[in-house]
Structures are given as structure tokens and as C-alpha cells.
Amino acid sequence: PVFYKDNMYRPGENPDTIRLKVFVNNDWNWITVSLKHTDVVSIRNHRKDGKISAPMLEKKNKKWFLRFAFEGQVNLNDTKLEERRILAVDMGVNTDAVCSVMTKDGTIHARKFINFAGDKDRIYHTLNKIKKVQKNSGSQNTKKLWRYARFHNDELARKVASKIAETAMQYQCDVIVFEHLDTKGKKKGSKKQKLQMWKKNTIQKTVEQKAHKNGIRVSHICACGTSKLAYDGSGYALRGTEAGNKSYSICRFQNGKTYNCDLSASYNIGARYFIREIQQN
């Protein structure tokens, strides 16, 4: 629930306390809640950049937390198309993200592979343990394991989002370009559990919040064919056994060139963004 100011919450007498109105003993009473001094300092620092909203009470892992949100005005950049520098991001299940810094003339200024293999191994190891427990004694004994897997999955999404935003700021990009990914519906195949755990929307939303805070715009393009088509225009790319490779991350173009699939897809994402902008202008 949300604690609205004056009606549900008030500042406490001590700077590190706050008073909340809660339903206790069949009546609404004011109680004093102590906050960590480090959290209070963080709230004060954030309040300098924007307006603080009413706190919200949340329950996580059998504990209660107060979440404060901040609202502020930010001017997004309006760089001309000829001078615009973008960060094209191809997100995937095997490699978390592949980023390419591009300009309108097609020049690739930088490339970045983002992959937290250790975090994913920890998650997949936990999921395999869940399978074994469910097979032997049912699903009633897996709550703790599921909580552990979800926690590390959320942490992985935060790490990937932070790395993408840091890359955009490092190379002074004006726009971050994502694919519009829609994986709704029933998943099939051997990777259905990985797809179910893939927090692509959380990553994109977190990156958008971090980017807007620093004046960087975020755009989405159609994902159709970005991975299947070769970036050099030679046609469809062959992957995995079709190209004679054991790895699905390496592809072969129609002209015989071997290249990284995700890197080629990031080039296509950037090119598709600039084509759309040129047509609109």
C-alpha cells in the first residue's frame, strides 16, 4: 500500500525516523519506524534532483520494506541525425547483450560484449536442482530454491541494464536502440525454461530509466530478420549445423564469410534505426 503524506505518514522527530499510520489492535494508530542512516542520506541526495513521492510498503522474503520514488524533469538530447551517435543493442539468452556504437554513415566506433556467465551458471544450476527435487518429492519443497533463483535472475537483469547504460554514457551516445521483443505465449523446445526466465522487459525498462536520467533517448525497432539476415546484405545467414559449426553463436554468410551472429544482428538493428529516421525526415 501507499502511505500518503500527512494522512498516512509524517516525518519523525528524529531525522532518521518516520511516522506511519497503520491498523494495529483494531484501530488506526501512528507508529515510529527507524530508518538506516545510509538510506536517509541516499534519500536526501536523490531529493536534490527531483520531488519525492509517497513511500510504498512492500514485502520481500518475509520482510517489509519502504520504497521511495522520485520524480524530476529531464531534458532529453535533440541531436541532429547527421551528428547522432547510437548504441545498437542485441539482447539474447546465451550472450546477455552485444552493443555496437554507430553513426549515420555506417561507421562502427566501438563494440561491446556483455555476458555474465557465472551468474547464469548459478541460476541454471539452481533450476537443475529444482528439477531433481520436483522429480523425487514434488514441488512443495522447492519454494526456497525458486526464491533463490528469482533473486539471482533479478540481480542479473540489473547488472546487464547497468552495463548497457554505462556503455552508452562511456561512448557519449545520443540514442539507445533495442529490438521490440515479443515472446508471449507458450514456449516450446529445449530452451523454453531459459526463455521463461529471460527478463528482457525488465532490462529494457531499467536501461530506459537510467538513460532518461542522463538525457539519452531510447528507441525500439522491429526485430524481424535482424538475426537471420547478414549485415553486409548478402542474404540469409546460416547458423549452427547448417553452417557446419558446433556453436550457434557463429554464422556463415552466403558469400562464405564467417561472423558472430549477435554482432551482425546489432549492426542490422542500428542500420534499421537509421533507415527509419531517414525515411521519416
Residue spans for each PLM region:
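Acidic carboxylate diad motif detector
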Residues: P1-K60, M197
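Positively charged, helix-rich recognition surfaces that bind polyanionic ligands
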Residues: K62-N281
